From Swiss-Prot:
Keywords: Cell cycle, Cell division, Cell inner membrane, Cell membrane, Coiled coil, Membrane, Transmembrane, Transmembrane helix
Coiled coil feature spans: 34-63
Family assignment from sequence similarity: Belongs to the FtsB family.
UniProt topological domain (Cytoplasmic) ranges: 1-3
Keyword hit for Coiled coil: yes
Cellular component, GO annotation: cell division site; cell septum; plasma membrane
Protein's job: Essential cell division protein. May link together the upstream cell division proteins, which are predominantly cytoplasmic, with the downstream cell division proteins, which are predominantly periplasmic.
Protein known as: Cell division protein FtsB
Compartments it resides in: Cell inner membrane
Known partners and oligomeric status: Part of a complex composed of FtsB, FtsL and FtsQ.
InterPro entries for this protein: Cell_div_FtsB, FtsL/DivIC
Species, as recorded: Cupriavidus pinatubonensis (strain JMP 134 / LMG 1197)
Amino acid sequence: MRLISLLLFVLLLAIQYPLWLGKGGWLRVWELNHQVQEQATRNQMLKLRNAKLEGEVKDLQDGTGAIEERARYELGMVKDGEVFVQFVAPAPKVSATPPLPPPPNSPAATGRH
């Protein structure tokens, strides 16, 4: 009886191995499902990007507004009679040389006022 139980247990393990660790086992199925989800996410991002680019292409083909906007912002073009004004924030002043130390006999150097 003990031999039959041991034989059945070994047979059960032999059957379970391909199910869990084999070529088409659960671990491989889980990995493939994970890859499919990642690819679906990438595909969705690319679809959104393609839709945006398609809209830009249609704008450039159909209307002059998009062309004018690109010419203004990317190339700095202006219409006749317009004046281009650009406000630039001033850069912080940077001293080229460090300040000189006070002379040795001055009140600032001795600590007396």
